[in-house]
Regions:
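Phosphate-group recognition and catalysis centered on beta-loop-alpha active-site segments
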Residues: 2-334
Length: 334
């Protein structure tokens, strides 16, 4: 009849079944990649990577590739100079799990530990590391250029003479310690020289090493020593793209094996299982996940209590810091 109320619309049975299957699949996908199933274990705390040991910090605002960061440091709170043995020892004494050092070849083929492309910013020398012999570099003051007041005073001047070490000296001085070696020049020869030294280490020592840097330099190390943990732009890109395609299944691709992945927290949310399930999955293939602050530019680390407060809840991976002495007491129980 024309006056009968409209009948309620019923979904076709096939549509209802399809929607139910989709809902179950989505729920399963969520649960399979939910970080809540891989929370922080009892007694576990973040892995602390001490960037260049304990280093002087500086304001990152306005920093570019050409900025002499030694000229813009904060008033020194510690007496240490980056990439020196006193700085590295202090970082480990404070609770660091790994220290990063910068590596360059000297004119006489030695593996020197120094960051900058030129000597002019931090030292009383000029030119590049590669233009000098190790003996010449030893005579420099690696604390010469540091100032917190625009050049009115230089509080670390005279305190860095003879402190520039070599890679073999760092290994000898820090037995058993985990080290990340960052090749500053993206040259195959630099990678081959570092690989030649690393090949002399026993397997248990080699297992504590990570090598990072440009694609060509790191690839040279990986060709000779594929068991060494590596990190470069190409390495990180290949791993994350492959994981984005396959990680929803729980599978970790081979491109993510034996890696160290420095990641800004803001990008982590796009990764299956972020944060702690992703970290746990990477750990199964001998890969470390290291959280860096901001965009990851200019060595931005978690250096203050306020920085530490930004960490994801229950973070079980690594963190990048220039001030292990400040952050370790906040993260290490007792």
């Amino acid at each position: 009849m024309l006056n009968d109320p409209p009948r309620p619309r019923r979904w076709p049975r096939r549509t209802a079944v399809t929607l139910a299957v989709l809902l179950v699949a989505v729920a399963g996908l969520y649960l399979r990649n939910s970080s809540t199933i891989a929370g922080q274990e009892d007694g576990q705390r973040p892995f602390l990577l001490a960037h260049r040991g304990i280093a002087q910090t500086f304001d990152l605002a306005g920093v570019t590739a050409d900025t002499c960061t030694a000229r813009i440091i904060h008033p020194p709170q510690v007496p240490y100079l980056e990439n020196t043995l006193p700085s590295l020892r202090a970082a480990f004494d404070a609770g660091a799990d790994q220290a990063e050092i910068d590596v360059q070849l000297t004119r006489d083929g030695r593996l020197a530990v120094f960051h900058d492309a030129t000597l002019d910013c931090r030292t009383d020398g000029t030119g590049t590391v590669g233009e000098h012999t190790l003996e010449e570099l030893r005579r420099l003051d690696v604390g010469y250029g540091y100032t917190a007041d625009g050049g009115a005073t230089f509080p670390l001047r005279g305190k860095g003479v003879g402190l520039l070490p070599t890679v073999p000296e760092v290994f000898a001085a820090l037995p058993g310690r985990s080290l990340k070696l960052d090749l500053k020049r993206d040259q195959q020869a630099d990678g081959e020289a570092l690989a030649a030294f690393l090949a002399t280490l026993p397997p248990d020592r080699l297992a504590t090493v990570t090598v990072s840097g440009g694609d060509a330099a790191v690839a040279a190390v990986a060709r000779r020593l594929p068991q060494v943990r590596t990190s470069s732009r190409a390495v990180i890109k290949d791993c994350l793209l492959d994981y984005a395609a396959l990680g929803w299944t729980g599978h970790v691709p081979d491109s993510c094996r034996h890696r160290e992945l420095p990641l800004p927290a803001r990008y982590g949310r796009w990764l299956w299982g972020w944060p702690n399930l992703f970290v746990a999955r990477m750990r199964t293939v001998d890969t470390r996940v290291i959280l860096v602050r901001g965009e990851g530019d200019w060595s931005a680390g978690f250096d203050t209590p306020a920085d530490v407060a930004e960490l994801p809840d229950g973070w079980a991976g690594g963190i990048w810091t220039n001030r292990t002495d400040v952050v370790a007491p906040l993260l290490i129980p007792g």
